[in-house]
Amino acid sequence: MIQTETRLTVADNSGAKELYCIKVLGGSKRRYAGIGDVIVVSVKEAIPNAKVKKGDVVKAVIVRTKKEVSRPDGSMIRFDDNSAVIINASNEPIGTRIFGPVARELRAKRFMKIISLAPEVL
């Protein structure tokens, strides 16, 4: 569960290291975002000569959360960190690599490019 002012790590090679959630997209009073949801973030920390700079406001999709997610078969999955992948206006990732596992819930939300780049889908 990600809400406004949450800090997230970045799971791609766009050059950003830390993100800060500004807004959860999908309704004016929506408070929480989970895996596969799109949020508006600010880049709080970035490496030099990166595709994004510190202070940039971009969109990102959440790929891992510490809060567990229930699956239809009754199982649950949770991760060790809150991570997101920076995306462009057409919901394609800016980076060319994804680091760490991502959740299977991204497939239902139509983020196929992220699924194909990820080293492991849990």
Swiss-Prot record:
SUPFAM superfamilies noted in UniProt: Ribosomal protein L14
N-terminal signal peptide: none
Record-linked PROSITE patterns: RIBOSOMAL_L14 (PS00049)
CDD domains the UniProt entry points to: Ribosomal_uL14 (cd00337)
InterPro entries: Ribosomal_uL14, Ribosomal_uL14_bac-type, Ribosomal_uL14_CS, Ribosomal_uL14_sf
This protein's record includes keyword rRNA-binding: yes
GO terms for cellular component: cytosolic large ribosomal subunit
UniProt keyword list: Ribonucleoprotein, Ribosomal protein, RNA-binding, rRNA-binding
Coiled coil: none
Family annotation (Pfam families): Ribosomal_L14 (PF00238)
Keyword Phosphoprotein: no
Role, per record: Binds to 23S rRNA. Forms part of two intersubunit bridges in the 70S ribosome.
Protein name: Large ribosomal subunit protein uL14
Species of the source: Desulforapulum autotrophicum (strain ATCC 43914 / DSM 3382 / VKM B-1955 / HRM2) (Desulfobacterium autotrophicum)
